[in-house]
Amino acid sequence: MCIRDSNNSYFAEGITVLDQSIIMLTWKGEQAFRIDISNFSIVENFSFEGEGWGICFNGEFLVMSNGTSQISFRDPETFEINHTIQVTWDGQPVPNINELECVGKEILANVWLQDVIISIDSISGNVQYFVSPTSISSTQGTNSNEVLNGIAFDKSSGGFWITGKNWTHIYLIEISYQETSSEIQETSGLNRFSEILIISIILLLPLLVIFRNKNEPETPNFKDSPP
């Protein structure tokens, strides 16, 4: 096992694997590093403007968040921005996009200081659904230094590992969802297809699932109870 101490002038943030390298962001240092995965030596560095929060690789681009509602898609060789999308919920920007995990055309992310994981369409930026693992996170602390802040896809099981700042455990969960029938849609009075989230915990822990559908646009707050 290799252990590398990072430069104390940098606050290390999100990382992702790219081929035989690890790409690591710095929070306010405006630097990203390419690190050899075999020995953790720095082989290249990139400059960027703004803050670095989360990063993942979707097979074509490095996908990066900066704590706003914007997500940038960057060239994996040069780190130059190819294009950006804005994350929205019912047409309203969702700020504080943090940790990212790319799975196919979907981007999973946590929203800083909100106890949720959201699914983002990588083309439109629309939030497709979200889940709130409060039954897990509530056992790990409730202050700003103990928030949900880690998502990793487990290809072998199809599940997701989640954890948070200063958490003592990581948890393997499975997330799936399905659309409701038109009959349910009509009786509920909703004017668009809604989604029911079905989630099961592989480690035999309950995971609270929250479904929310709004008719009136407002600043997104995923801690609100469903209307």
Language model features by range: what are they?
Residues 92-124:
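Loop/turn-rich, solvent-exposed surfaces of beta-rich toroidal or solenoidal domains
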Residues 150-184:
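Blade-level signature of beta-propeller repeat domains, shared across WD40, Kelch, NHL, RCC1
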Residues 100, 181-227:
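Secretory targeting signatures
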Residues 30-34, 70-74, 115-119, 169-174:
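Structural motif
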